[in-house]
Design a protein with these regions (language model features):
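N-terminal beta-alpha supersecondary unit
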Residues: 2-117, 123, 127
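Conserved phosphate-binding/catalytic loops in two-lobed NTP-binding clefts
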Residues: 153-154, 322, 338-364
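A contiguous, well-structured pocket-lining segment that forms one wall/lid of small-molecule binding clefts
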Residues: 60, 75-93, 97-112, 237-322, ...
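DPxDG-like acidic metal-binding loop motif
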Residues: 130-147
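Glycine-rich phosphate-binding/hydrolytic loop that grips phosphoryl groups
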Residues: 160-163, 352-391
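Glycine-rich beta-strand-to-loop/alpha-helix junction loops that act as flexible
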Residues: 124-126, 143, 188, 322-331
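Conserved phosphate-binding catalytic cores of ATP/NTP-utilizing and phosphoryl-transfer enzymes
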Residues: 154-182, 367
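A short helix-loop
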Residues: 5-9, 16-33, 175-180, 185-187, ...
Length: 393
């Protein structure tokens, strides 16, 4: 089986083509993996601007699909002139009536190449930015209609869980088998969640942020320190520098650990963001050393809270496995802290490869293959759902 995956939930246009390998577990080879990031375009806004994201997805997606097909040796150009039949053209026009730029590009693609040997399409249906999600969904629906290929909608957060479980050996990816129940910590720019997993594909959110997501808090704190977007890597870079030089944080720059002792599994990071602002304003101007102090204290505060909540969740759900996913899971200090926690408490830890931490098509492809392996039915009608919970997938 060959599957094409589409991911457009935020500011990365990602296309992957994978080929399933025989075996009991979900195992596959990656034939192509394309990612086009919009980070440079969104820097001026200090965050992702939804309609700009939609526009850039629309401009890029058809060409990226063609490039992925070519890299996977699945693109065969037509030798004879071909025109889309009138009835099918009308359906395509109706499907992409709100995406005229994509419509023109798709017509060129369909009339210029033969139908590729693709057996299924997986596409992110949510959560995420709905204008961006619609671009990927409409592209998937157009491909499915023109080439008569079934479509499997994927929950983006389940994709991050599956990414955490992926192992790679001899260029073959496999969804690792592990002991359940498990707990997943999903940390990104839009989500901070603790998910109980009695078994794979059965999810219950047991804790989440009441305000800012952890990645959002990193970005906002970075802006207060006049650091470039995206702020998370910049905060981490300064924090690591501070650790290496043994920098001691000034007492008046110490930060709170919000909801550390709340007794529940929920999070709140808006107070931490406000605390950073208060300390910056109190100093008036801050030098580079003070920036490193605040970055160090901020990263430590976030990590302390995450570790405490994970430890409590593991105990309450009696989990034997911790899975970490989402863009913030690439943070070196958080990874190190979770590794130490797992070793102390005696549970298994799964973290994604760094290239699978941020949004990508491989995690959507793997999740789509998992759905197919469990005989989940494809869908004909898809709707972008910006708030689709992993519980409902």
């Amino acid at each position: 089986m060959i599957l094409l995956a589409i991911e457009t939930s935020c500011d990365e246009t990602a296309i992957s083509i994978v080929k399933r390998v025989r075996g009991k577990q979900v195992r596959f080879e990656v034939l192509s993996n394309k990612i086009l990031s919009q980070i440079d375009l969104h820097t001026q806004y200090g965050g992702v601007f939804p309609m700009l994201a939609k526009r850039e997805h629309t401009k890029a997606i058809t060409q990226l699909i063609a490039e992925a097909l070519g890299e996977a040796d699945l693109l065969v150009e037509r030798t004879n002139s071909y025109h889309i039949p009138s009835a099918l053209r009308k359906k395509l026009d109706a499907q992409l009536m709100r995406e005229p730029e994509m419509l023109s590009a798709m017509k060129v693609l369909f009339e210029g190449i033969q139908k590729p040997t693709i057996d299924a399409i997986a596409v992110t249906e949510g959560p995420g930015l709905e204008p961006a999600l619609w671009v990927g969904i409409n592209a998937a629906l157009a491909l499915g209609m023109m080439w008569d290929i079934p479509i499997y909608p994927v929950n983006h957060m389940e994709g991050h869980i599956v990414a955490g479980l992926l192992s790679i050996e001899n260029d073959v990816y496999e969804i690792s088998d592990t002991d359940y129940p498990a707990t997943a910590l999903l940390i990104s720019g839009g989500h901070t969640e603790l998910v109980n997993i009695p078994k794979l594909r059965s999810y219950s959110v047991v804790g989440k942020t009441r305000d800012d997501a952890v990645g959002e808090a990193f970005d906002k704190a970075a802006r207060m320190l006049l650091l470039p977007y995206p702020g998370g890597p910049e905060i981490s870079r300064l924090a690591e520098h501070a650790r290496k030089e043994g920098l001691v944080v000034d007492e008046d720059l110490r930060l709170p650990r919000p909801m550390l002792h709340s007794g529940d599994l929920h999070f709140s990071f808006s107070g931490l963001k406000t605390a950073v602002l208060t300390r910056v304003k109190k100093r008036g101007t801050i030098n580079e050393e003070e920036k490193r102090m605040i970055a160090l204290e901020f990263e430590n505060a976030v990590t302390d809270v995450l570790v405490a909540k994970v430890k409590q969740a593991m105990y309450e759900t009696r989990s034997s496995t911790l899975i970490i996913g989402g863009g913030v899971s690439a943070n070196t200090h958080i990874r190190f802290a979770m590794k130490n926690l797992a070793e102390r408490e005696g549970f298994s830890l799964f973290v994604p490869n760094r290239n699978l931490s941020t949004d990508n098509g491989i995690m959507i492809a793997a999740t789509g293959l998992l759905h197919i392996a469990e005989d989940k039915k494809p869908k004909v009608k898809l709707v972008a759902n910006g708030s689709w919970s992993v519980e409902g997938c």
